[in-house]
């Protein structure tokens, strides 16, 4: 079945072209496939396709900044769901919609919500579009379809938001990989995996920032270069103590030490 899985670079390319694709998560997680598209490309035809052929809940994946900009509160202040999916209250565009549930109305709500010029005055709650807040750090922090949709949209140079919809079988059961492959063949869609997206980001993202460097003198070894790095995902700081000059052509002995404030 691996031959039906496209490299994540191809999935990013599909997103950049405004095309829909299927994203699959791990078997030991939700073990499902979602129809995914960058939110800025989610027109009425796309919403109708998702409703007709995905059959799951059509959701709007947003980053934390946009959720705050829209003033959206979480659906639950005590999230006990299995995967802690961060649903916010549902939304509707304040202007231009009728009942709110039509494909056109939901597409309008989505385009209104993701606009750079939109704020909380442009939407109302509740509504027929279901935003989900992605974790800062994306799939490197949480390996969910929400984070994957936002990550891929960003990597594709799009508005950092996505529309996702779980794919279900005709009988109402969840589509697994064999069924997802048939859906992909039928509609000429590419399939990618969240696992490949995680690997891609690990290999290509620069998530460590060098924030400070100074020379210190210690009774244990004399002079050292003390370099402080910050992890951009969780803001944790890491300290490297370097003795002497590092030659990239030589093997350098490294010792990793877990900090204990009370004993060090």
Where are these regions (language model features)?
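Catalytic domains of riboflavin
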Residues: 1-264
């Amino acid at each position: 079945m691996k031959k039906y899985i496209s490299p994540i670079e191809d999935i990013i390319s599909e997103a950049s072209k405004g095309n829909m694709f299927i994203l699959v998560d791990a078997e030991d997680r939700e073990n499902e496939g979602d129809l995914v598209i960058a939110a800025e490309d989610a027109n009425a035809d796309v919403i109708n396709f998702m409703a007709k052929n995905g059959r799951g809940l059509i959701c709007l994946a947003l980053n934390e900044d946009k959720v705050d900009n829209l003033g959206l509160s979480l659906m639950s202040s005590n999230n006990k769901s299995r995967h802690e999916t961060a649903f916010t209250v549902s939304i509707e565009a304040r202007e231009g919609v009728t009942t709110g549930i039509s494909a056109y109305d939901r597409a309008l709500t989505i385009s209104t919500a993701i606009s750079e010029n939109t704020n909380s005055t442009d939407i109302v709650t509740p509504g027929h579009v279901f935003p989900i807040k992605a974790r800062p750090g994306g799939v490197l922090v949480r390996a969910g379809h929400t984070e994957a949709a936002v990550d891929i949209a960003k990597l594709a140079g799009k508005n950092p938001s996505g529309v996702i919809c779980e794919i279900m079988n005709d009988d109402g059961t969840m589509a697994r990989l064999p069924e997802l492959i048939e859906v992909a063949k039928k509609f000429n869609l590419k399939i990618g995996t969240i696992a490949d997206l995680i690997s891609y980001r690990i290999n290509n993202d620069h998530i460590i920032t060098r924030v400070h460097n100074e020379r210190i003198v210690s009774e244990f070894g004399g002079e050292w270069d003390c370099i402080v790095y910050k992890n951009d995902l969780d803001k944790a700081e890491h300290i490297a103590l370097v003795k002497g000059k590092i030659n990239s052509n030589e093997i350098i002995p490294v010792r990793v030490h877990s900090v204990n404030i009370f004993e060090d």
